[in-house]
Every structure is written in C-alpha cells, then in structure tokens.
C-alpha cells in the first residue's frame, strides 16, 4: 500500500441505511490513488501509515455547481438591493452580470487565478476534494477559453480535482444585444468546437430561463454539444417553469440545477432519466426566494438530489459547502443524511463520476475528508468551527493547517 489509514470511523455512503452510520474503527488501504482495502487489519505493509485515532472519515465533498472563476466585486450591489434598488436599475447603472463580464474580460489569466484561489481555499477548508467550475463571464471565444484554462490550472496550485464546464450561454453579451439567436449560433459554430477540440471542458451548460435563453435556443446548444462528444446540464426552472428540466432529461443531461419552479411533469421526466436534481440553497437564500423546490415529489419519484454552493458574485457569494448542507436542511427540509449524500454520492453522479467518486468503496478514487466530529449530522448542524482534520485526494494526504490534533 502507498498509504494506510487506521482507526478510522467510516461513513461510506454506499447505498443503504448502513452507509450513513459510522463504522467501528477500520483501516483504509490506498494504492495508486484508489481505495484498495477496507477492513480491520492495522498491520498491512504500507509506505506511510497514519493513525486517525477514531476520527470520522467521509468521502471527499464534491461541489458540483460553481462559478468560481471571475474578476471583480459586487458588494456594492448587495447594499443597493438591501436599500430597495431594483435589479433593472442596478444593471442600468452598469451593475449586474455584465459588470462581472467586463471585469473578467479585462483580467489576465494570472489576475483571474489570483482572485480565484482564495475562494477555492474556502471550499477546500470545508472538505471539498472535487469542484466543478463554469465559464460564462467571458461570452467571447477568447475570454471563455481564458476562464476554462484558469479553472483547469487550479489543480496545479491546490490539491483538488477540477471539472470545467462551458457556460457560454449564460447571458447575452452586449455585442449581441437583441440578437440572441445569432449569439447561440456563434456559440455552436465558434466556441463549442474549439472547447471540444482542446478538451477544455467535459460538459456544456445553458441558463434556460425567461431572462436567459428559451427552450429552442437551449436545445440548439445541447444538440451541438452532444454532436461534439460533450455532456449537457442546465440552469432550469429557477424563476419560472419553461420546461428546461424535461429538455435536459431528454438529452440525458448530467443535472438540472436550481429547479425551484419544477412541476410534477418535470420531476417525472427526471425520474425517467439519469439526470440529477441539483439544489442551490445559497442562491435561494441570498435572493430571498419563496418558491421552494419540490422536495417531496423528488423523494416520491426517487430522483437523486445533489447540493452545490453555486459560488458566484451576484447571487451566491458563499465558499463553504457545509453551509450549503445546513441551508438545504433548514430551508428545504432535507435530512442531514440527504444533505451529505447530496455533496458526495449524488454530486458525483451530477458530474458523471458515479462509478468512481462519492463513496468509500474499494476501487473508487481515494478522495476522503477526515473530520474531528462525532456524527455525520454534525456537518449539517454546526457551521463555522474548525472541524476538518485532513483531506485525501487521489491518495495524497493533506492535513488542514487550521486544525490541530487532540
């Protein structure tokens, strides 16, 4: 073995009720970045051995929806909104999403990296080992590629796995004002082929909404993405029920995200597919929304529910995935087990890694979070304390610098 972790209380999150219950002290043997052994043997030959002294071990957390790479700051808009200034007026004054677009376009790759790393560090401190990162603040070929390159480069600076997603269909750039169909054609003809050829992303996302892109435009992007060998996912049913979730499910999309206005027909479409329902409680909270996602219907039809941070400067400036677990429980009434599975097992499925990440299981990637807590429910219950002891990513052990052993 390359690494042997002993005296670990495992929360494997394998299917079934026992997957959530902490085990008696066990050992985890890791070889070539994979979980090679799970059992009680503490004397296996290993290059490195660490006694965890009864600490709780879960799969590494997976943040399956973020907009982590961007430049600029929109805290002034936060103040304006709290003073009652409508979004339309904020946008007229140069704010809103286009202010982030302008800032991101002007920033170099080095500047984007410098601004992104502190946000990434926040996620890692909450136990994240895998993170999805979308483009969408460039809206030109050059700037979308710039964002994706910065996203991919993060794993060279931090111990983390990055899954880049192309979100050129995030907003209408000023150059295409009044010409949404032309912009969609530009994405399909100019951006997607280059991103696919250079392997800068594994999937393509679309903001399918009344203030974004309609169903026909979304399907045009989906069809193009699939033609280029890329998976699809969607921002759907956040502000209205357009049918974007059902469309995403029809294309066997990885996930449909937000879904506050999803109806029964949309839930049934998800149930007939492998598409995951991703809940984004941070945006719900920050925007003070009132329309709850249909949690009971999703449970009734057995649709897997992932949870993500949706880190972005406008609607979810939160860099702590355990805070999102707490919000999912308090705002959406998920159980702590559903919340933990939502940032591990189901988040892995939402990124296409259901057979390699999100569970502690032999043959799976050795991606682990090691905690100084008694029970997994503590992750959803308490926020703000230094609970993370260490992370393991592809078998590499990294102790959290803010946490000390007892």
From Swiss-Prot:
Pfam families linked to this entry: Amidohydro_1 (PF01979)
Pathway(s) where this gene product acts: Amino-acid degradation; L-histidine degradation into L-glutamate; N-formimidoyl-L-glutamate from L-histidine: step 3/3
Any one Gene Ontology molecular-function term assigned to this protein's record: zinc ion binding
Catalytic activity: 4-imidazolone-5-propanoate + H2O = N-formimidoyl-L-glutamate
Entry GO CC: cytoplasm
Annotated binding of 4-imidazolone-5-propanoate, by residue: 74, 137, 170, 238, 315
Subcellular localization, as worded in the UniProt entry: Cytoplasm
InterPro entries registered for this protein in UniProt: Amidohydro-rel, HutI, Metal-dep_hydrolase_composite, Metal_Hydrolase
A GO biological process held by the record: L-histidine catabolic process to glutamate and formate
EC number of this enzyme: 3.5.2.7
Record: residues binding N-formimidoyl-L-glutamate: 137, 312, 314
Transmembrane segments: none
Protein family per UniProt: Belongs to the metallo-dependent hydrolases superfamily. HutI family.
Protein's name according to its UniProt entry: Imidazolonepropionase
Species of origin: Vibrio vulnificus (strain YJ016)
Name of the gene: hutI
């Amino acid at each position: 073995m390359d690494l042997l972790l002993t005296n670990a209380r495992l929360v494997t999150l394998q299917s079934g009720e026992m997957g959530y219950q902490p085990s008696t002290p066990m050992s985890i043997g890791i070889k070539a970045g994979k979980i090679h052994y799970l059992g009680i043997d503490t004397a296996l030959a290993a290059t490195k051995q660490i006694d965890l002294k009864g600490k709780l071990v879960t799969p590494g957390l997976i943040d399956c929806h973020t907009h982590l790479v961007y430049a600029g700051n929109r805290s002034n808009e936060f103040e304006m909104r709290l003073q009652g200034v409508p979004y339309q007026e904020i946008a007229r004054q140069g704010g809103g999403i286009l202010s982030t677009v302008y800032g991101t376009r002007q920033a170099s790759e080095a500047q984007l990296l410098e601004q992104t790393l502190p946000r990434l560090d926040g996620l890692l401190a909450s136990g994240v080992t895998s993170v999805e990162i979308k483009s969408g603040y460039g809206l030109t070929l050059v700037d979308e590629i710039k964002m994706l390159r910065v996203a991919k480069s993060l794993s060279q600076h931090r111990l983390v796995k990055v899954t880049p997603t192309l979100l050129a269909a995030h907003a209408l750039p000023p150059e295409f004002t009044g010409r949404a169909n032309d912009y969609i054609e530009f994405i399909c003809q100019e951006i997607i082929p280059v991103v696919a050829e250079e392997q800068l992303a594994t999937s393509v996302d679309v903001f399918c909404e009344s203030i974004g892109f309609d169903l026909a435009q979304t399907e045009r992007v989906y069809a193009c993405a699939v033609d280029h060998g890329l998976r699809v996912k969607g921002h759907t049913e956040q502000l209205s029920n357009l049918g974007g979730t059902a469309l995403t499910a029809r294309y066997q999309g990885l996930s449909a995200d937000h879904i506050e206005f999803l109806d029964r027909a949309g839930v049934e479409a998800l149930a007939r597919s492998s598409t995951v329902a991703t809940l984004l409680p941070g945006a719900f909270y920050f925007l003070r929304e009132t329309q709850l996602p249909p949690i009971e219907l999703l449970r009734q039809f057995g649709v897997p529910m992932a949870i993500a941070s949706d880190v972005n400067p406008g609607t979810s400036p939160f860099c702590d995935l355990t805070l999102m677990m707490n919000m999912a429980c308090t705002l959406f009434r998920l159980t702590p087990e559903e919340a933990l599975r939502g940032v591990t097992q189901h988040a892995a499925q939402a990124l296409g890694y259901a057979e390699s990440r999100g569970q502690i299981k032999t043959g799976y990637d050795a991606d682990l979070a090691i905690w100084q807590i008694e029970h997994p429910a503590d992750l959803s219950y308490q926020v703000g304390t230094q609970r993370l002891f260490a992370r393991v990513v592809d078998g590499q052990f990294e102790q959290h610098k803010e946490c000390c052993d007892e």
